[in-house]
């Protein structure tokens, strides 16, 4: 059934709630509703059931006659779409069906595939029809027959035409040529009109065969592509109808046999065709033979589409596009084939065909095909541009309000692929920086190829427009390095209408007008052919100074990921996502190429921040890339700064062999540090390199020299104990190895590089972190925290209050020596943040306890211990009795009570590191002894006596009494002479003796 695809929800999305307009659209098409009426009756039960189920009734046996607005609306929609479908020609139907198929899910597509196969098998018709279809299918893929058609089309005289047919047939014997509906007449009396008719017949023949072209038939495809420039030139001379060429272009845009490179080769001619149609619609040609606007349209009405313009804003997008466009630019010739009469049906409308805009070049020429594109016409049956294509302007037509699209299926196919028309469609359709693709990337490439095909407005041939210099060479990829000659066949034979106007200036203004910074985040394709096509615009016109105009050929250029100074602020006005510096994804700039050594060109350009010019190198070989000059880059539209930078970088690529040779020699002789060599490798690893196995002289094998330097650096790091091994050098070297593993030049050596990277990773893990002091576990209050930095003695504070240069221990408690009596208390003090230490190491005079430290520069356990030196140890003190110590402590505490608390009286401070301090040693009648030690000496003796427990119990009442005394410290209550008693108390409590100095 013809409306099978209409059951998709996309068909009903664009015209909900517009019953009256749909009725009016159906009433307008009564002459063609005989067949659709039956189809409508047949479709009513199914439509009713579907709508009923959608409304919440799951019963499939619902009454079909039940009146519901949704059911009636769907039936009217089916009728409207069916009527429109019946009015379209074969090419228009194909384009619309292609657009609708992109909206279906996989099960629906498979169902349609089975249905199409069954229909092709059962409904081929009679044997005569079957034979005719087979013959057309064979001829469509026969290069000999297609070459005969091409020769016949390019021949002007009938006799030459016949000779060309016979000679080419005798030379080729690969495949037999079958007959078709194309016949050549040998009458010598053929006038110009009959010659035009023969050319038109040839185009009809090509139009019938082009959909049957099989993918993979490169020879036949090249003949089809070769016909395009000649047909476009004949269209500009008004020899053949414009609609035929538009239909051929529309098939080429969506044909699976046409690659992106082929579509880019068509960009010049598609843009020429568009400008010719616009000029013809504006009345600039000598005779408006095919595109004369109808009087009804100028008057504001049309016999076939009087309600189209009014319904375009409310009815189905397909119906509005078709009906409005069918009344916008109708062919005036009535003798044309019926399949070309309605060719303009799905073109977007032009509401103001006769407006003149002073700022537009078309307005200066005498007329303007002005019209703002109807937003609903940018939808195809409810399929918005956002749903059908990527967010970028996929035909590159950044159309202002004064321009219009190609009035044909080229525009229809472009709308299907996401043509933006007007300022509403220049904004980004991405959501949070994510592209929305409703179809496969192949179609996206096709849409971009269409955009690139419509991005060039310059004429191609100069001088005589009849001269055939427009045919592309057999190898289409060779056009990139040679900018083709340009001429002014843009207007065909109507150049005299422009008078004194400089065509080059006009072309550059057109290119600048249609160039808008792409809002897309994708970086898929840029036209290398279109880059070449605008070289004359850039070199001839001096007004094209800014980057927006110089990049006219990059109408669909990828979004730059850097807001560099090359892009002026004016180019960022309408950018929806340029302010977001997204994370660059390397897969966006990778492309598959058959040229050896060029697969990594994208990463190299990204490192230079010139990745938007990646498509210039897509079809280049490695040798061609090294021959690029700054003049060539500017000729293809690269800005002056970028071309200069890129040319300098290419010159540096030629010096890589000398740089690697120098690095290798200096590493072997020890004249270069490893960090310098690693830096040189970093600059080279991202550059394009040929594989090691590529033929050529060894001195030019950059990859081999690169691996030699890598081997020398890694061997030095692993084997040389004097090599500077640090985290930074190892990290950069591992990054270089990671990039080398994925480099095309080292694909056959990836396993060796992985092993080398693994060895370096183990070496990096085994390295000790820099600037961190390692302590054994259990030493110090932090229990040997390995991450604690060592204190540098040079950066520590000094003691300025006593005029001494000795450094102060940087601890929380930095009081003088008289605080010992306070710190002798066993209870934890409030200013201590550590956990209560065990009893024995509570007073640690090595600088880790709460008291003052008298050995700060030797607090680390990494310094040598003097325990094993018996010559420097004084004799151990004799053991004391517990009752003797208790009596001494009672006497000292009684002395403390005779001195009242005087907070304002501070005893004179003595230098706590002075060597003249008296240190009392336990034992005997407790006479003070003066011990003078040299720095670096220490005394540590152990005594197994542990009879100080009774003394601790006697201290508990005194400690509580001291807490209640008002918080006055013992240092403020005792004179300096009690120092001996304090030291004796410490020695009586503990068994370790430390020498303080």
Swiss-Prot record:
Signal peptide: none annotated. Residues 1-37, 802-822, 854-864 have a biased composition (Polar residues). Keywords: Cytoplasm, Developmental protein, Phosphoprotein, Repressor, RNA-binding, Translation regulation. CDD domains: SAM_Smaug. It holds the Pfam family SAM_1. Residues 600-654 form the SAM domain. Residues 44-69, 329-338 have a biased composition (Low complexity). Belongs to the SMAUG family. Translation regulator that binds to the 3'-UTR of specific mRNAs such as nanos (nos) and prevent their translation. Prevents translation of unlocalized nos in the bulk cytoplasm via the recruitment of cup. This is Protein Smaug. It comes from Drosophila erecta (Fruit fly). The lineage of its organism: Eukaryota, Metazoa, Ecdysozoa, Arthropoda, Hexapoda.
């Amino acid at each position: 059934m013809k409306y099978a695809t209409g059951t998709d929800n996309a068909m009903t999305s664009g015209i909900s709630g517009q019953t009256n307009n749909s009725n009016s659209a159906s009433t307008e098409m009564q002459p063609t509703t005989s067949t659709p009426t039956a189809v409508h009756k047949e479709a009513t039960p199914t439509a009713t059931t579907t709508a009923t189920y959608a409304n919440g009734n799951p019963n499939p046996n619902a009454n079909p006659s039940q009146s519901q607005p949704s059911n009636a609306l769907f039936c009217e929609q089916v009728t409207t779409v069916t009527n429109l479908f019946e009015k379209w020609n074969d090419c228009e139907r194909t384009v619309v069906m292609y657009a609708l198929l992109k909206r279906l899910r996989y099960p629906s597509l498979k169902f349609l595939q089975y249905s199409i196969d069954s229909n092709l098998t059962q409904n081929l018709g009679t044997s005569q029809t079957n034979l005719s279809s087979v013959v057309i299918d064979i001829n469509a893929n026969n290069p000999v027959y297609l070459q005969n058609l091409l020769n016949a089309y390019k021949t002007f005289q009938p006799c030459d035409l016949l000779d060309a047919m016979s000679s080419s047939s005798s030379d080729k014997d690969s495949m037999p040529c079958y007959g078709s509906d194309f016949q050549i007449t040998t009458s010598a009396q053929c006038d110009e009109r009959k010659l035009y008719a023969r050319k038109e017949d040839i185009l009809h023949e090509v139009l019938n065969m082009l959909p049957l072209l099989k993918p993979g038939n490169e020879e036949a495809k090249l003949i089809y592509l070769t016909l395009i420039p000649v047909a476009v030139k004949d269209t500009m001379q008004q020899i053949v109808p414009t609609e035929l060429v538009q239909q051929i272009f529309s098939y080429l845009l969506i044909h699976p046999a046409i690659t992106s490179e082929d579509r880019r080769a068509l960009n010049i001619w598609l843009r020429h065709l568009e400008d010719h149609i616009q000029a013809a619609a504006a009345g600039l040609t000598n005779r408006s033979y095919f595109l004369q606007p109808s009087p009804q349209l100028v008057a504001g009405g049309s016999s076939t589409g009087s309600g189209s313009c009014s319904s375009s804003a409310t009815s189905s997008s397909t119906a509005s596009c078709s009906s409005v466009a069918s009344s916008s630019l109708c062919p005036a010739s009535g003798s044309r084939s019926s399949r070309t009469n309605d060719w303009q049906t799905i073109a977007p409308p032009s509401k103001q065909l006769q407006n003149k805009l002073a700022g537009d070049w078309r307005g200066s020429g005498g007329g303007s095909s002005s019209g703002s594109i109807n937003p609903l016409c940018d939808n195809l049956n409810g399929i918005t541009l956002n749903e059908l294509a990527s967010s970028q302007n996929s035909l590159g037509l950044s159309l202002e309000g004064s321009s219009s699209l190609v009035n044909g299926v080229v525009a229809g196919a472009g709308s299907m692929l996401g043509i933006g028309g007007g300022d509403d469609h220049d904004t980004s359709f991405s959501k949070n920086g994510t592209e929305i693709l409703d179809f496969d990337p192949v179609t996206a490439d096709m849409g971009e190829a269409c955009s690139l095909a419509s991005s060039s407005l310059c004429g191609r041939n100069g001088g005589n427009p009849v001269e055939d210099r427009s045919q592309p060479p057999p190898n289409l990829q060779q056009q990139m390095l040679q900018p083709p000659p340009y001429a002014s066949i843009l207007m065909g034979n109507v150049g005299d209408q422009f008078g004194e106007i400089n065509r080059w200036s006009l072309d550059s203004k057109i290119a600048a007008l249609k160039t808008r910074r792409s809002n897309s985040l994708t970086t898929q394709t840029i036209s290398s052919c279109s880059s070449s096509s605008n070289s004359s615009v850039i070199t001839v016109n001096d007004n094209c100074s800014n980057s927006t105009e110089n990049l006219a050929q990059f109408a669909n250029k990828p979004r730059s990921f850097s807001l560099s100074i090359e892009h002026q602020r004016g180019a960022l006005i309408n950018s929806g996502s340029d302010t977001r510096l997204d994370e660059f994804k390397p897969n966006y700039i990778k492309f598959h190429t058959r040229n050896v050594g060029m697969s990594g060109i994208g990463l190299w350009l990204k490192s230079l921040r010139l990745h938007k010019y990646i498509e210039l190198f897509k079809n280049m070989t490695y040798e061609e890339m090294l021959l690029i000059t700054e003049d060539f880059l500017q000729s293809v539209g690269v800005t002056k700064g970028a071309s200069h930078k890129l040319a300098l970088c290419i010159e540096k690529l030629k010096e890589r062999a000398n740089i690697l040779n120098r690095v290798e020699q200096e590493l072997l002789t020890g004249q270069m540090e490893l960090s310098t060599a690693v830096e040189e490798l970093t600059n080279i690893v991202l550059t394009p390199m040929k594989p090691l196995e590529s033929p050529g002289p060894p001195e030019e094998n950059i990859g081999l020299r690169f691996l030699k330097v890598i081997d020398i650096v890694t061997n030095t790091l692993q084997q040389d104990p004097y090599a500077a091994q640090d985290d930074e050098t190892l990290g950069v070297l591992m990054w270089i190895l990671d990039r080398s593993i994925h480099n095309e030049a080292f694909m056959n050596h990836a396993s060796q590089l992985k092993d080398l990277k693994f060895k370096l990773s183990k070496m990096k893990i085994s390295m000790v972190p820099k600037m961190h002091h390692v302590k054994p576990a259990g030493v110090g209050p932090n229990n040997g925290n390995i991450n604690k930095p060592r204190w540098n003695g040079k950066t520590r504070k000094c003691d300025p209050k006593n005029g001494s240069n000795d450094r102060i221990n940087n601890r929380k408690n930095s009081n003088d020596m008289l605080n010992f009596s306070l710190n002798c208390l066993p209870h934890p003090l409030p200013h201590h943040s550590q956990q209560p230490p065990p009893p024995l190491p509570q007073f640690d005079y090595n600088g880790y306890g709460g008291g003052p430290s008298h050995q700060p520069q030797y607090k680390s356990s990494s310094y040598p211990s003097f325990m094993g030196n018996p010559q420097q140890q004084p004799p151990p003190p004799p053991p004391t009795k517990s009752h003797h110590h208790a009596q001494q402590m009672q006497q000292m505490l009684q002395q403390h009570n005779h001195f009242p608390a005087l907070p304002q009286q501070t005893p004179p401070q003595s230098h706590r590191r002075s060597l003249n301090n008296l240190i009392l040693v336990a034992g005997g009648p407790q006479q003070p002894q003066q011990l003078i030690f040299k720095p670096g000496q220490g005394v540590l003796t152990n005594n197994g006596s542990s009879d100080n427990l009774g003394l601790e119990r006697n201290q508990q009442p005194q400690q509580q009494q001291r807490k209640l005394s008002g918080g006055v410290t013992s240092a403020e209550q005792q004179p300096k002479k009690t120092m001996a008693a304090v030291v004796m108390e410490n020695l009586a409590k503990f068994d370790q003796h430390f020498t303080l100095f």
